[in-house]
Amino acid sequence: MTDLLKRRMSDQRIMGIAIALFLGAVTFVLIVRSPISIWNNSEILTDSSVFEYIAFGMQQGEMPYRDMFDHKGPLLYVINYIGMLIQYYKGVWYIEFIAVYLTCFFVYKTARLNCNRLACLGTVIICATLLYNYYEAGNLSEEYAMPFIGIALYIFLDYFLNRNISKIRLMVCGFTAGGVCMLRPNMTALWIVFSLAVILECVQKKKLRDLSFFILYFCIGFFVLVLPLLIWLVVNNSFTQFIDCYIDFNMIYSTGNGGKEVMLRRWE
């Protein structure tokens, strides 16, 4: 019996390694064409060059929003700053690899909630096929938002399907929401929809104590990521410009005549 158990554990370990390598191979195929790839010497596209320029400015003591204009979230510039510390201009590719790998991993994990391993690997391949051309641009805010979305989707679905929940999971879910808010807030629909579903369920079943528990630990996770970024902006006198560029500017930009209004506003 002991030998059988050891054999099963060994088989599971081998299977886990094989799946990890498979996901790594899929990730590599997805982003090897990225302009910031260490194997690619093609021209970096406009958005990515802006992010890396701001990261370079940060290395010189400048601040996004205050000294350099852009309307993306501060986490994106921090990611590029860390990438440049790893390897000048190319180091962000390693972070990109981790982000895409986590996305693939949680696509697999989410599919595994209701499918066998083979079907889950097929799901990863299908998703990778759909995203293949998209990742060619490289170093986009959506790339870094997707692992946060994948993690949160897994946590929400595991809760609704299997009732698996814990303080850690709630904080991780809040952390992922904070990450997307600090990258690209128009991608937060998943948290809005599923959080409303949880709230409605708790109210309907009169589980208000559970609801307060969920909200508390979700908010803790959210502010673990968001608060340090906001403090960093405040301390460096960039918070007012952050509100102007990231919130006000994007609200105008998202309207029907946003492009014209934005240009007029910037040149008033």
Language-model features: locations:
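Loop-to-helix entry region of an early transmembrane alpha helix in multi-pass inner-membrane enzymes
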Residues: 74, 78, 86-105
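Transmembrane-helix signature of polytopic, membrane-embedded enzymes
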Residues: 98-129, 146-147, 163-168
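Membrane-lumen/periplasm interface segments of specific transmembrane helices
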Residues: 214-257
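Membrane-interface alpha helices of multi-pass inner-membrane proteins
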Residues: 169-185, 191-196, 224
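Start-transfer (signal-anchor) and selected internal transmembrane alpha helices
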Residues: 1-33, 112, 167-170, 213-220
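Perimembrane helix-loop-helix junctions
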Residues: 4, 190-226, 241
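Membrane-interface transmembrane helices that cradle and orient dolichyl/undecaprenyl
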Residues: 112-118, 152-172, 203-205
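Short acidic/glycine- and proline-prone juxtamembrane loop motifs at membrane-interface regions
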Residues: 137-145
